[in-house]
């Protein structure tokens, strides 16, 4: 069903139909307006959003690219983006890269071809060569310190501060041999989390022992394997984990060895994904405002789309959430 067909059925011009559909019908009689709207409803007319966007130069659509939508961190982040975008009248196209830099590049191209107004991206950790030079669409980077060849918005937390505070908390609980399990240091985020752990040890006159560190990725399996390895070689009484999934895996390994958490080994995570409070034991963690990060990313992106004067870097606060694992 086209506008011309509606106009023919209503016995009016296409210009009249267009004005009614776009709310610019002040000079049109109520009788004519109701007649056109009745035909529109009965015929199931759906406006061509892409064609309309070519005239008004926007699609009211934003793209969201995440590395792993199955990771509860990114699920909550995506919800924050979607809810905030919806309140502002925007739709969201979600793209999952599976931590694949080639898919990431493809999705950047696809989203631009769909004429999205802006893109929010949590880039693949290992993708050091991500290039935005050919991307005219406004971009906001989520929690990633990546050098870019064009100005982009950035939403961050203080990753050094997160693990510094986590390690300091374990020390305050009497831990003297603290292990660290996290992702490998191929990106700034992971390097900063390791730095925070080391700095906390140094500031408290505790030795940094390389054998007490296990680095792989941000998965439950990493926590499980890492805890088993640390226990084989060290008298660990505390474990600082790079995220909550790692902490959950570590606690599973400890339980299998008959080690009580927190009596014998205390464990702290990072993120505060929703399952952390329901785990056994409920997980002490450093809370990142995950949902709020999504909300703030949308606000920043809209400011960029509307070409408002704005600070392109926004650093959000973290805080300790103490539960039963420490």
Region annotations inferred by a language model:
Residues 1-59:
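N-terminal helix-turn-helix DNA-binding module of bacterial transcription factors
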Residues 16-19, 54-68, 169, 177-184:
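Short beta-strand segments enriched in small/hydrophobic residues
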Residues 30, 43-110, 114-117, 195-198, ...:
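Amphipathic helical "hinge" segments at domain boundaries
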Residues 67-75, 94-103, 144, 155-165, ...:
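Hinge/beta->alpha junction and helix N-cap segments in small-molecule ligand-binding domains
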Residues 108, 116-123, 179-181, 213, ...:
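Periplasmic-binding protein-like
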Residues 121-165, 186, 245, 271-283:
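Flexible loop/hinge segments that line or gate small-molecule binding clefts
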Residues 176-177, 208-212, 260-266:
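Short acidic capping loops at alpha-helix termini that bridge into adjacent secondary structure
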Residues 228, 233-326:
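Flexible loop/turn connectors
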């Amino acid at each position: 069903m086209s506008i011309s067909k509606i106009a023919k059925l209503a016995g009016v011009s296409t210009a009249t139909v267009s004005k009614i559909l776009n709310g610019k019908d002040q000079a049109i009689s109520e009788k004519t307006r109701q007649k056109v709207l009745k035909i529109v409803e009965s015929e199931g007319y759906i406006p061509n959003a892409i064609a309309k966007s070519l005239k008004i130069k926007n699609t009211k659509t934003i793209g969201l690219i995440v590395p792993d939508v199955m990771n509860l961190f990114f699920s909550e982040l995506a919800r924050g983006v979607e809810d905030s975008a919806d309140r502002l009248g925007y739709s969201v196209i979600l793209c999952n890269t599976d931590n694949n830099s080639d898919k990431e590049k493809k999705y950047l191209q696809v989203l631009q071809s769909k004429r999205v107004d802006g893109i929010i991206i949590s880039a693949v950790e290992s993708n050091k060569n991500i290039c935005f030079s050919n991307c005219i669409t406004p971009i906001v980077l989520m929690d990633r310190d990546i050098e870019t060849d064009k100005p982009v918005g950035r939403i961050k937390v203080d990753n050094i501060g997160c693990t510094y505070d986590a390690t300091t908390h374990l020390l305050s609980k009497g831990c003297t041999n603290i292990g660290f399990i996290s992702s490998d240091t191929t990106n700034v985020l992971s390097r900063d989390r390791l730095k925070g752990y080391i700095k906390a040890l140094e500031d408290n006159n505790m030795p940094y022992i390389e054998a007490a560190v296990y680095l792989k990725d941000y998965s439950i399996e990493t926590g499980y394997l890492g805890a088993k390895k640390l226990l084989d070689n060290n008298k660990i009484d505390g474990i600082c984990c790079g995220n909550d999934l790692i902490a959950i895996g570590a606690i599973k390994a400890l339980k299998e060895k008959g080690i009580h958490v927190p009596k014998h080994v205390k464990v702290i995570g990072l993120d505060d994904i929703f399952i952390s409070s329901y785990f056994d034991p409920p997980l002490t963690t450093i809370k990142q405002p995950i949902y709020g990060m999504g909300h703030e990313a949308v606000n920043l992106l809209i400011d960029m789309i509307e070409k408002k004067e704005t600070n392109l870097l926004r650093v959000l606060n973290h805080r300790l959430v103490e539960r039963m694992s420490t």
